[in-house]
């Protein structure tokens, strides 16, 4: 007999840096998920990824307190900012886009870089082909004030 699914949980955790402190610990603990077991499994699965990259994860938890999780690719905005060479700044130490997208640019990327990002994100996007995925990535670039050349 299949396990009974109790629910699912979506989190965004930095690759290789899952630990039992907030926000991961409380989110898992109140659902009865073994926090250390998840942290070890997540860190092992994301060790090949760029350390510190935000990784969306969907955790499905069951009535017997077991769980499964699926990692996705980092957000398009993170990949675009990285490709544009935007440096982390501020108290949260994050790269920022333009304060006035459409009026001023925060950086530039090439069409080739947009294609690479679209190909990497293809499995997570609702696009049928790379061209449609590129249009989605171009929209993200426009909304954070990154100009696309070429």
Curated annotation (Swiss-Prot):
Which post-translational modifications are recorded for this protein?
A: One or more lysine residues are methylated.
- One GO term of the cellular component aspect? cytosolic large ribosomal subunit
Classification via InterPro entries: Ribosomal_uL11, Ribosomal_uL11_bac-typ, Ribosomal_uL11_C, Ribosomal_uL11_C_sf, Ribosomal_uL11_N, Ribosomal_uL11_N_sf
Q: Which UniProt keywords apply?
A: Methylation, Ribonucleoprotein, Ribosomal protein, RNA-binding, rRNA-binding
A GO BP annotation: translation
Q: Where is this region: Disordered?
A: 83-111
Q: Which SUPFAM superfamilies match?
A: Ribosomal L11/L12e N-terminal domain, Ribosomal protein L11, C-terminal domain
- Please give the CDD domains that the UniProt record associates with this protein: Ribosomal_L11
Under the heading SMART domains, the entry gives: RL11
Per the entry, what this protein does is: Forms part of the ribosomal stalk which helps the ribosome interact with GTP-bound translation factors.
On assembly, the entry states: Part of the ribosomal stalk of the 50S ribosomal subunit. Interacts with L10 and the large rRNA to form the base of the stalk. L10 forms an elongated spine to which L12 dimers bind in a sequential fashion forming a multimeric L10(L12)X complex.
Entry-linked NCBIfam families: L11_bact
Family as reported in the entry's similarity comment? Belongs to the universal ribosomal protein uL11 family.
Q: Which PANTHER family match?
A: 60S RIBOSOMAL PROTEIN L12, LARGE RIBOSOMAL SUBUNIT PROTEIN UL11M
Please state what the protein is called.
Large ribosomal subunit protein uL11
Species in which this protein is naturally found: Paracoccus denitrificans (strain Pd 1222)
Gene label = rplK
């Amino acid at each position: 007999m299949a396990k009974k699914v109790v629910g699912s949980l979506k989190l965004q955790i930095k690759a290789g840096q899952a630990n039992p402190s907030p926000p991961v610990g409380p989110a898992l603990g109140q659902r009865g998920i073994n926090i250390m077991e998840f942290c070890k499994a997540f860190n092992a699965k994301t060790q090949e990824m760029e350390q510190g990259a935000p990784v969306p994860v969907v955790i499905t938890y069951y009535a017997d307190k077991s769980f499964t999780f699926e990692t996705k690719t980092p957000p398009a905005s993170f990949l675009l900012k990285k490709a544009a060479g935007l440096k982390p700044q501020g108290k949260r130490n994050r790269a920022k886009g333009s304060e006035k997208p459409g009026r001023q640019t925060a950086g530039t990327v090439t069409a080739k870089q947009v294609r690479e990002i679209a190909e990497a994100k293809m499995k997570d996007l609702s696009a049928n082909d790379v061209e449609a995925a590129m249009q989605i990535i171009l929209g993200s670039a426009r909304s954070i004030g990154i100009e696309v050349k070429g």
